[in-house]
Regions:
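Phosphate-binding/switch loop-helix module in NTP-utilizing enzymes
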Residues: 75-104
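Walker A (P-loop) ATP-phosphate-binding motif of ABC ATPase nucleotide-binding domains
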Residues: 3
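N-terminal phosphate/diphosphate-binding loop that engages ATP/GTP or pyrophosphate donors
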Residues: 22-82
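Phosphate/Mg2+-binding loops and adjacent switch elements
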Residues: 96-165
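Hydrophobic anchor at the beta1->P-loop junction of P-loop NTPases
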Residues: 6
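The conserved Walker
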Residues: 10
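Conserved lysine of the Walker
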Residues: 14
């Protein structure tokens, strides 16, 4: 299982890019999973539903299952938030895990940069040695591979090479130092 982060500031286009590349990777036969980090509380069920009521009553875990999908909700109840590595261990077998968020964990990542949104914020690269490529709407002065924010096909091709272990060949020769 390969792990690849998609990192950038809020509003840079991470989710949109991920939505575009997943179907291309799946079409080529890759089994893709995703972990998204939320900086805020979130709900996956609704107040008043049985599963919500069971959680409110004190269950640590509630698993909801149907013929289409299942979801496991785990209440931390004051316990520390699990690390990315702990969350990765919970996933089933797959070829690629895309990680949205956890931008400071030591995993290879593609940085997503939008000039208007991120103009006053520093790029993660070159300060982040885990950035292996950049998807951007403006040319950047970097030796890393660069892709247009709208060029999902090129990003997907780079990711396929990464999954196949050919990431070094997917990068320009000058960037292999």
């Amino acid at each position: 299982m390969k792990v690849l982060g998609i990192a950038g500031y809020s509003g840079s286009g991470k989710t949109t890019l991920i939505e575009k590349i997943i179907p291309l990777l799946v079409r080529d036969g890759l089994r893709v999973s995703l972990i998204k980090h939320a900086h805020h509380a979130f709900e996956v069920d609704y107040p008043g539903k049985d599963s919500w009521r069971h959680r409110q009553a004190g269950c640590t875990e509630v698993l909801v299952s149907s013929a289409q999908r299942w979801a496991l909700m785990h209440e931390l109840r004051g316990a520390p938030e699990p690390t990315l590595q702990e969350q990765l261990a919970r996933l089933g077998p797959c070829d690629l895990v895309i990680v949205e968020g956890w931008k400071f964990d030591p995993i290879p990542r593609i940085e997503v940069h939008r000039s208007g949104t991120d103009a006053r914020r520093p790029l993660l690269y070159p300060g982040d040695p885990h950035v292996i490529a950049v998807a951007t709407d403006e040319p950047l002065d970097t030796r890393l591979p660069q892709f247009g924010l709208d060029d999902a096909a090129a990003v997907a091709q780079f990711i396929r090479a990464f999954v196949a272990g050919r990431e070094a060949r997917a990068r320009p020769a000058a960037a292999a130092d």
